[in-house]
């Protein structure tokens, strides 16, 4: 193992700040396995240890070590209200400290049982307490059903609630987070990236670096979602049984993705577990379009069809209302993130140490709504 200083100098990368938008990119194509933190705060640019054989020209370009006592809103925005109700999820995302907090160098996304909410009654001109519910709609916006959603939880992304991109990445990069997963049976935790150029899912592309099922600590899924195409599957999914005796919920592990010009490789604790060749995707546009920058997102979803325990299983974890006790005090339903980092390659500078950057572009936006009424976000992990 060798120690590589994290230095910003000599990086011939595009670092473009336009209002609320920061685009980080590189055009130099190379490979990297994974990297681990030793110590240090964001501002100190600490050293990181890279496995032998990893090119030494990859440096940390952007990171959050969560060393403060609150979320850094120059880097992150909150997700609000309902999310992915097509999968019949049962929570509302909030920005409340009981759902999103930072302490002792760790981000906490905590799900809790919270069966009611306050709603404004325009007829009485006062707030009233009502059951917390979600609404499923068809593709035309027609309501299919309203169902109980008695939980709150936390989710953050590098896009604000108005759709303004704070940070997004393009070119070659390696993104990694160190995470400890919640124990609650109906928790669906994820670390993922999504495109910012195209307005609809899955046209924008999606990279699921980590998806987990609370009832199965040995389960790991890494996915790529590409645009719909008639007669083709839009998802390239890969589920793994990880040989760690189920300690993903009692210890931290690293989850990463190396995105390159022709493929992406997923990593668990520094070991490659899955590779996706773009040429095998039905549509590879989101992953090769240099203007489709990728933003980061952490979500702690409660309930939903992703949690189905196999075909004909007698166990049901899709309905979190059967596991309310696991969410009452947050002790079992806490998703912890130690850090998130993005590396990009350092290019060789000329003798006069001149550098180049990518061309500028207008800030990108994605659709995100904050409202008192639960809103349905159609993006799916």
Regions found by a protein language model. Name each.
Residues 1-17, 31-36:
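Bacterial Sec-dependent N-terminal signal peptides
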Residues 5, 23, 265-267:
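Conserved short hydrophobic patches within well-ordered secondary structure
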Residues 9, 24, 29, 356, ...:
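Intrinsically disordered, low-complexity serine/threonine-rich segments
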Residues 16-24:
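Hydrophobic helical h-region of N-terminal Sec-dependent signal peptides
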Residues 38-356:
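GH16 jelly-roll
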Residues 42, 348-381:
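Ser/Thr/Gly/Pro-rich low-complexity, disordered linker/stalk segments of secreted
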């Amino acid at each position: 193992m060798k120690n590589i200083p994290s230095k910003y100098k000599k990086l011939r990368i595009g670092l473009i700040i336009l209002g609320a938008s920061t685009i980080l990119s590189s055009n130099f194509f190379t490979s990297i396995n994974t990297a681990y933190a030793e110590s240090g705060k964001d501002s100190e640019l600490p050293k990181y240890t890279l496995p032998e054989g990893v090119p030494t020209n990859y440096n940390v370009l952007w990171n959050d070590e969560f060393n403060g006592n609150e979320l850094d809103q120059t880097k992150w925005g909150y997700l609000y209200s309902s999310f992915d109700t097509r999968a019949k999820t049962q929570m509302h995302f909030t920005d409340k400290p009981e759902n999103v907090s930072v302490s002792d160098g760790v981000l906490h996304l905590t799900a809790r049982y919270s069966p009611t909410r306050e709603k404004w009654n325009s007829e009485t001109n006062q707030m009233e307490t009502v059951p917390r519910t979600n609404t499923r709609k068809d593709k035309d916006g027609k309501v299919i059903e309203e169902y109980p959603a008695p939980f709150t939880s936390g989710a953050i992304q590098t896009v604000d609630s108005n759709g303004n991109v704070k940070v997004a990445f393009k070119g070659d990069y390696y993104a990694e987070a160190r995470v400890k997963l919640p124990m609650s049976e109906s928790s669906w935790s994820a670390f993922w990236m999504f495109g910012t150029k195209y307005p609809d899912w899955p046209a924008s592309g999606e990279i699921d670096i980590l998806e987990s099922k609370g009832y199965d600590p040995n389960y790991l899924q890494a996915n790529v979602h590409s645009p719909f195409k008639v007669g083709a599957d839009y998802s390239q999914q890969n589920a793994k049984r990880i040989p760690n005796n189920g300690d993903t919920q009692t210890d931290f592990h690293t989850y990463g993705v190396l995105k390159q010009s022709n493929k992406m490789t997923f990593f668990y604790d520094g070991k490659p577990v899955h590779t996706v060749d773009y040429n095998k995707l039905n549509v590879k546009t989101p992953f090769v379009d240099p203007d489709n920058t990728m933003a980061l997102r952490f979500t702690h979803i409660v309930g939903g069809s992703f949690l189905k325990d196999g075909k004909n299983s007698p166990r049901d974890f899709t309905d979190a209302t059967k596991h309310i006790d696991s969410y009452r005090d947050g002790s079992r339903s806490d998703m912890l993130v130690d850090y998130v980092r993005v590396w990009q390659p350092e290019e060789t500078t000329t003798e006069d140490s001149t550098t180049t950057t990518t061309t500028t572009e207008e800030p990108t936006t994605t659709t995100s709504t904050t409202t008192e009424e639960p809103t349905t976000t159609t993006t799916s992990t």
